Amino acid sequence: MAYAVVRVRGSVGVRGDIADTMKMLRLHRVNHCVIIPDTEHYTGMIKKVKDYVTYGEIDKDTLVALILKRGRLPGNKRLSEELVKELTELPVEELAEKVIAGEIKIKDTPIKPVFRLHPPRKGYDRAGVKKGFSIGGALGYRSGKINDLLNKMM
Protein backbone atom coordinates (compact mmCIF):
# COMPACT_ATOMS: atom_id res chain seq x y z
CA MET A 1 0.00 0.00 0.00
CA ALA A 2 1.17 3.52 -0.76
CA TYR A 3 0.08 6.88 0.56
CA ALA A 4 -0.44 10.08 -1.39
CA VAL A 5 0.58 13.06 0.75
CA VAL A 6 -0.47 16.58 -0.31
CA ARG A 7 0.75 19.73 1.41
CA VAL A 8 -2.21 21.96 2.24
CA ARG A 9 -0.77 24.72 4.42
CA GLY A 10 2.15 27.09 3.88
CA SER A 11 5.42 27.56 5.71
CA VAL A 12 4.78 30.65 7.86
CA GLY A 13 4.88 29.88 11.58
CA VAL A 14 5.91 26.24 11.15
CA ARG A 15 8.14 24.79 13.89
CA GLY A 16 11.66 23.90 12.79
CA ASP A 17 11.37 20.15 13.27
CA ILE A 18 8.15 20.04 11.26
CA ALA A 19 9.73 22.15 8.50
CA ASP A 20 12.68 19.73 8.37
CA THR A 21 10.31 16.77 8.09
CA MET A 22 8.48 18.51 5.23
CA LYS A 23 11.83 18.94 3.45
CA MET A 24 12.63 15.26 3.96
CA LEU A 25 9.27 14.39 2.41
CA ARG A 26 10.03 16.82 -0.46
CA LEU A 27 6.92 18.87 0.28
CA HIS A 28 8.45 22.30 -0.24
CA ARG A 29 5.33 24.14 -1.48
CA VAL A 30 1.58 24.10 -1.08
CA ASN A 31 -0.26 21.68 -3.44
CA HIS A 32 2.79 19.49 -3.94
CA CYS A 33 2.13 15.76 -3.73
CA VAL A 34 4.42 12.80 -3.05
CA ILE A 35 3.73 9.07 -3.15
CA ILE A 36 5.35 7.22 -0.27
CA PRO A 37 5.30 3.57 0.80
CA ASP A 38 3.60 2.39 3.97
CA THR A 39 6.66 1.89 6.18
CA GLU A 40 7.23 2.62 9.84
CA HIS A 41 9.63 5.50 9.10
CA TYR A 42 7.33 7.28 6.68
CA THR A 43 4.32 6.73 8.94
CA GLY A 44 6.12 8.54 11.76
CA MET A 45 7.00 11.39 9.43
CA ILE A 46 3.39 11.71 8.28
CA LYS A 47 2.13 11.78 11.87
CA LYS A 48 4.55 14.60 12.63
CA VAL A 49 3.30 16.81 9.75
CA LYS A 50 -0.39 15.79 9.90
CA ASP A 51 -1.44 19.35 10.81
CA TYR A 52 -0.04 20.70 7.53
CA VAL A 53 -0.85 17.93 5.03
CA THR A 54 -3.64 15.61 4.01
CA TYR A 55 -2.99 11.98 3.11
CA GLY A 56 -4.61 8.68 2.30
CA GLU A 57 -4.28 5.45 0.34
CA ILE A 58 -4.02 6.08 -3.40
CA ASP A 59 -5.62 3.67 -5.86
CA LYS A 60 -4.18 2.43 -9.15
CA ASP A 61 -6.37 4.47 -11.51
CA THR A 62 -5.61 7.73 -9.73
CA LEU A 63 -1.87 6.99 -9.68
CA VAL A 64 -1.86 6.24 -13.42
CA ALA A 65 -3.67 9.53 -14.11
CA LEU A 66 -1.31 11.40 -11.78
CA ILE A 67 1.79 10.02 -13.51
CA LEU A 68 0.50 10.79 -17.00
CA LYS A 69 -1.02 14.23 -16.28
CA ARG A 70 1.32 15.73 -13.69
CA GLY A 71 4.43 13.54 -13.81
CA ARG A 72 7.57 15.20 -15.12
CA LEU A 73 11.11 14.26 -16.07
CA PRO A 74 14.17 16.39 -15.26
CA GLY A 75 14.00 19.47 -17.46
CA ASN A 76 10.22 19.69 -16.87
CA LYS A 77 9.51 17.32 -19.77
CA ARG A 78 6.03 15.78 -19.88
CA LEU A 79 5.44 12.03 -19.72
CA SER A 80 3.55 9.82 -22.13
CA GLU A 81 2.72 6.12 -21.95
CA GLU A 82 5.41 5.31 -24.52
CA LEU A 83 8.05 7.36 -22.70
CA VAL A 84 7.26 5.73 -19.35
CA LYS A 85 7.53 2.27 -20.92
CA GLU A 86 10.83 3.19 -22.57
CA LEU A 87 12.39 4.61 -19.38
CA THR A 88 11.11 2.12 -16.80
CA GLU A 89 10.62 -0.92 -19.07
CA LEU A 90 7.12 -1.26 -17.58
CA PRO A 91 3.71 -0.10 -18.82
CA VAL A 92 2.19 2.71 -16.74
CA GLU A 93 -0.47 0.46 -15.19
CA GLU A 94 2.11 -2.11 -14.10
CA LEU A 95 4.38 0.63 -12.73
CA ALA A 96 1.44 1.98 -10.69
CA GLU A 97 0.66 -1.50 -9.33
CA LYS A 98 4.28 -2.03 -8.26
CA VAL A 99 4.48 1.41 -6.61
CA ILE A 100 1.29 0.72 -4.64
CA ALA A 101 2.55 -2.74 -3.67
CA GLY A 102 5.82 -1.20 -2.45
CA GLU A 103 8.08 -3.07 -4.89
CA ILE A 104 9.25 0.13 -6.61
CA LYS A 105 9.54 3.69 -5.30
CA ILE A 106 8.83 6.66 -7.57
CA LYS A 107 12.19 8.14 -6.57
CA ASP A 108 13.97 5.06 -8.01
CA THR A 109 12.55 5.81 -11.48
CA PRO A 110 13.54 8.72 -13.76
CA ILE A 111 10.21 10.40 -12.90
CA LYS A 112 10.48 13.37 -10.54
CA PRO A 113 9.25 12.32 -7.08
CA VAL A 114 7.13 15.46 -6.55
CA PHE A 115 3.89 16.08 -8.44
CA ARG A 116 2.99 19.77 -8.70
CA LEU A 117 -0.78 20.06 -8.55
CA HIS A 118 -3.37 22.80 -9.03
CA PRO A 119 -5.45 23.97 -6.09
CA PRO A 120 -8.61 21.83 -5.95
CA ARG A 121 -11.40 22.87 -8.30
CA LYS A 122 -14.40 24.09 -6.27
CA GLY A 123 -12.18 24.17 -3.16
CA TYR A 124 -11.82 21.58 -0.45
CA ASP A 125 -15.62 21.41 0.14
CA ARG A 126 -14.88 21.66 3.83
CA ALA A 127 -14.63 24.11 6.70
CA GLY A 128 -11.13 25.23 5.72
CA VAL A 129 -7.49 24.27 5.82
CA LYS A 130 -6.98 24.72 9.55
CA LYS A 131 -9.15 21.85 10.79
CA GLY A 132 -8.79 18.10 10.61
CA PHE A 133 -10.73 16.09 8.04
CA SER A 134 -12.64 14.20 10.72
CA ILE A 135 -14.18 17.42 12.08
CA GLY A 136 -14.95 19.02 8.73
CA GLY A 137 -11.61 20.47 7.65
CA ALA A 138 -9.05 19.50 5.03
CA LEU A 139 -6.08 18.27 7.10
CA GLY A 140 -4.97 14.83 8.21
CA TYR A 141 -5.94 11.31 7.23
CA ARG A 142 -8.76 10.92 4.69
CA SER A 143 -8.33 7.24 3.61
CA GLY A 144 -9.68 6.61 0.08
CA LYS A 145 -11.16 10.09 -0.28
CA ILE A 146 -7.67 11.33 -1.20
CA ASN A 147 -8.40 10.00 -4.70
CA ASP A 148 -11.33 12.41 -5.10
CA LEU A 149 -9.14 15.30 -3.96
CA LEU A 150 -6.31 14.35 -6.33
CA ASN A 151 -8.74 14.18 -9.26
CA LYS A 152 -9.93 17.70 -8.41
CA MET A 153 -6.32 18.90 -8.31
CA MET A 154 -5.03 17.38 -11.58
From Swiss-Prot:
GO terms for cellular component: cytosolic large ribosomal subunit. Signal peptide: none annotated. Keywords: Ribonucleoprotein, Ribosomal protein. It comes from the Archaea. GO terms for biological process: maturation of LSU-rRNA from tricistronic rRNA transcript (SSU-rRNA, 5.8S rRNA, LSU-rRNA); translation. GO terms for molecular function: RNA binding; structural constituent of ribosome. InterPro entries: Ribo_uL30_ferredoxin-like_sf (IPR036919), Ribosomal_uL30 (IPR039699), Ribosomal_uL30_arc (IPR005997), Ribosomal_uL30_CS (IPR018038), Ribosomal_uL30_euk_arc (IPR035808), Ribosomal_uL30_ferredoxin-like (IPR016082). Belongs to the universal ribosomal protein uL30 family. NCBIfam families: PRK06049.1, uL30_arch. This is Large ribosomal subunit protein uL30. It comes from Methanococcus maripaludis (strain DSM 14266 / JCM 13030 / NBRC 101832 / S2 / LL).
